UniProtKB/Swiss-Prot annotation:
Source species: Rattus norvegicus (Rat)
Quaternary assembly: Homodimer.
Protein's job: Catalyzes the NAD-dependent oxidation of all-trans-retinol, alcohol, aldehyde and omega-hydroxy fatty acids and their derivatives. Oxidizes preferentially all trans-retinol, all-trans-4-hydroxyretinol, 9-cis-retinol, 2-hexenol, and long chain omega-hydroxy fatty acids such as juniperic acid. In vitro can also catalyze the NADH-dependent reduction of all-trans-retinal and aldehydes and their derivatives. Reduces preferentially all trans-retinal, all-trans-4-oxoretinal and hexanal. Catalyzes in the oxidative direction with higher efficiency.
Reactions catalysed: a primary alcohol + NAD(+) = an aldehyde + NADH + H(+); 10-hydroxydecanoate + NAD(+) = 10-oxodecanoate + NADH + H(+); all-trans-retinol + NAD(+) = all-trans-retinal + NADH + H(+); 9-cis-retinol + NAD(+) = 9-cis-retinal + NADH + H(+)
Free-text remark on how the cofactor is bound: Binds 2 Zn(2+) ions per subunit.
GO biological process, one term: retinol metabolic process
Binding site for Zn(2+) 2: C98, C101, C104, C112
Protein name, per record: All-trans-retinol dehydrogenase [NAD(+)] ADH7
Amino acid sequence: MDTAGKVIKCKAAVLWGTNQPFSIEDIEVAPPKAKEVRVKILATGICGTDDHVIKGTMVSKFPVIVGHEAVGIVESVGEEVTTVRPGDKVIPLFLPQCRECNPCRNPEGNLCIRSDLTGRGVLADGTTRFTCKGKPVQHFMNTSTFTEYTVLDESSVAKIDAEAPPEKACLIGCGFSTGYGAAVKTAKVSPGSTCAVFGLGGVGLSVVMGCKAAGASRIIGIDINKDKFQKALDVGATECINPRDFTKPISEVLSDMTGNTVQYTFEVIGRLETMVDALSSCHMNYGTSVVVGAPPSAKMLSYDPMLLFTGRTWKGCVFGGWKSRDDVPKLVTEFLEKKFDLGQLITHTLPFHNISEGFELLYSGQSIRTVLTF
């Protein structure tokens, strides 16, 4: 492309501090350096993790460009890039896969050491490619997709099928893959089992879809927003409950409902209290509980160790346990083969400049997933 090797001026949604609104700014995006890729974003989803930065519950430096769930087209590549080329359709990866570190080389690992889940805010060489009003702007989780153009390390880019529709396939960059994988890959839900899913947002519904795909016979959705129940039933939940409708602890409610046979529970909210509730709700001898929701930074969890001593398994899950560069293209292929329907998760599609409206839909509970298009 004729922009290769040049600074690109474009629009981006910049956060200048916590609890501040997005500001649509003119920014400059530098050319990619060695082993880097510059991508033109086509569509990007709004995820609750982005809101953690706004609220200050996830550590970040400012100013920053958040967003991490997207599909784009490679505009140009730096030296030594071998896996993608200009014109390729790609998904940015908030969880990279360098294929060299211990977690990448271990068949059970996926948390690459190049991951930036702690707010470092720069690329692998320690610098940023974004500038706004003469100031450097931080990257977010190796991605930064709330911008017309972004720069990523090659290890944070997965080439996908050119036929994949960006406004749907972008969900594979985070929300869908995280939830679906939590059920089929991390928990390894068994056929005929009973599952309980705490939180019925986009990721929680993806967990429900994964439980159904794995053959669970009973899938109980749990949320304080009853407006989400019908969508949960549509994607595979067998019943839904609101904890506020009961005076008993939710673990006792689930035990009464199922005869104490809940084998798998999933916390998809990111609240410390519900993490313990989910653990308490699975069977004490053979139950597995998976933490899927991103926890708040610098918070400590307190729980009764007897919950684990009696035989429960407590697991964490980042990006559904998938190895990103290897598995994302496969998930896109499965989507194109209609093995799952991403359209069920999308409630709103808005132009990028309406990003603030998209977050208001999230806050009000009206949206499952809002996708921004460019």
